[in-house]
């Protein structure tokens, strides 16, 4: 166990859930430290007031609950979506992108309150411990970080439940009357892990899903929407200008009702193991489809292809916790440059889990119907030019083929 005897005051990232409530009590009883709680409102909704009440019940005097929804979407989610970031081709990074903002505020609140350290509830098996701590050290190289899951003697959630009962800490239960799934939620997504989901062959029970109706139960009629973009960011919905957080919240509602954004995946954690989770990202799934659609008519081919080549590396940096690294910032500058003319409108239909693009338009479109028409293009494109183009590109292939023929 690491020694933290010199720690007198700790800022704890506190959700009000089982893990962080036990950590709070552990910091008080084992370290004798004064605890300051910080709860970020990233759009998780009803979690917040119970977190305040539980912190008060546990004797906390300094309770910080901050509405960071606009900052979260504007400064973290939207920059990531300019890159069309997907980790391992499927994961929209809903948990990953929230950690840098939470850790940033932990470091700032520690400085504001004169705390000796910060603490988080991430386990020693997961990615979040890395994300929190890499961010903290990037912003304050001298910060002290307490990670109780790596220090205490608890080995399982059963141990946690026993500790909670011994210290009169309320334990919520899910609809099956058991200890809850491990869950995370913010304005971009919700996730569920653990219990039956630890078997990758087991179908997720329907009650696991927090954000969406089943696609099979979604309306039999499509919902049509239009999203407006400016410099790569969504700025309007159905012609109405709205703030980043408001827009994402509205897309979440639309996606929820139409069963959009569910994924069941097994991912490769940064720490080396595979994990299975059920993620729901209704608004983000719609936004990604719309952003790619507007890029399709406003981005040059070379720029678009380069972005797609760089995207996996960019997504991996976010997944692994390197939001504040120089390489992520370098890639962000390139991505942001590519978005200068990414503006216009995209029309979509939402239907039973599907996001269907039905139109896109932009004053800065590179699409030319005069060039692609099957009718008379009035000299806009001379098809005879294609012969020389093909001949030059075939030169190396013909040379290789000739050598193979000579070699028999």
From Swiss-Prot:
Sites where the protein binds L-citrulline: 91, 96, 127, 131, 182, 191, 267, 279
GO terms for MF: argininosuccinate synthase activity; ATP binding
Pathway in which the depicted protein is active: Amino-acid biosynthesis; L-arginine biosynthesis; L-arginine from L-ornithine and carbamoyl phosphate: step 2/3
Catalytic activity, EC: 6.3.4.5
Residues that span the membrane, as ranges: none
Record GO cellular component, one term: cytoplasm
A biological-process GO annotation: argininosuccinate metabolic process
Protein family according to the UniProt entry: Belongs to the argininosuccinate synthase family. Type 1 subfamily.
Entry protein name: Argininosuccinate synthase
Lineage: Bacteria, Pseudomonadati, Pseudomonadota, Alphaproteobacteria, Hyphomicrobiales
């Amino acid at each position: 166990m690491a020694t933290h005897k010199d720690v007198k005051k700790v800022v704890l990232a506190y959700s009000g859930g089982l893990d962080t409530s036990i950590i709070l009590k552990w910091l008080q009883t084992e370290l004798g430290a004064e605890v300051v709680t910080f709860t970020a409102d990233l759009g998780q909704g009803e979690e917040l007031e119970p977190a305040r009440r539980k912190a008060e019940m546990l004797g906390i005097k300094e309770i910080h609950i901050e509405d960071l929804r606009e900052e979260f979407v504007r400064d973290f989610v939207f920059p990531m979506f300019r890159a069309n970031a997907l980790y391992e081709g499927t994961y929209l990074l809903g948990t990953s992108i929230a950690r840098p903002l939470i850790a940033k505020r932990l470091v700032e609140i520690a400085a504001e309150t004169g705390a000796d350290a910060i603490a988080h509830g991430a386990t020693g098996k997961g990615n979040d411990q890395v994300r929190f701590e890499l961010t903290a050290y990037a912003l304050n190289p001298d910060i002290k970080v307490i990670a109780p899951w790596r220090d205490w003697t608890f080995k399982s959630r059963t141990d946690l439940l026993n500790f909670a009962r011994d210290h009169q800490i309320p334990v919520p239960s899910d609809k099956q009357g058991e200890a809850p799934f491990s869950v995370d939620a913010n304005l971009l997504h919700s996730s569920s892990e653990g219990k039956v989901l630890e078997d990758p062959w087991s179908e997720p029970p329907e009650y696991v899903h927090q954000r969406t109706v089943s696609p099979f139960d979604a309306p039999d009629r499509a919902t049509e929407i239009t999203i407006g973009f400016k410099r790569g960011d969504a700025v309007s919905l159905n012609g109405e200008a709205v703030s980043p957080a408001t827009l994402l919240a509205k897309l979440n509602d639309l996606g929820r009702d139409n069963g959009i954004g569910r994924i069941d995946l097994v991912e490769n954690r940064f720490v080396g193991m595979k994990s299975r989770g059920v993620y729901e990202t209704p608004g983000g799934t719609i936004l990604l489809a719309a952003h790619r659609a507007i890029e399709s008519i406003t981005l040059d081919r070379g720029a678009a292809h380069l972005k797609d080549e760089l995207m996996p590396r960019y997504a991996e940096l976010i997944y692994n916790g390197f939001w504040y690294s120089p390489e992520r910032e370098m890639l962000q500058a390139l991505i942001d440059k590519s978005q200068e003319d990414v503006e216009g409108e995209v029309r979509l239909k939402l239907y039973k889990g599907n996001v269907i693009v039905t139109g896109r338009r932009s004053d800065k479109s590179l699409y030319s119907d005069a060039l692609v028409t099957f009718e008379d293009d009035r000299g806009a494109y001379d098809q005879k030019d294609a012969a020389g183009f093909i001949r030059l590109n075939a030169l190396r292939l013909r040379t290789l083929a000739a050598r193979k023929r000579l070699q028999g």
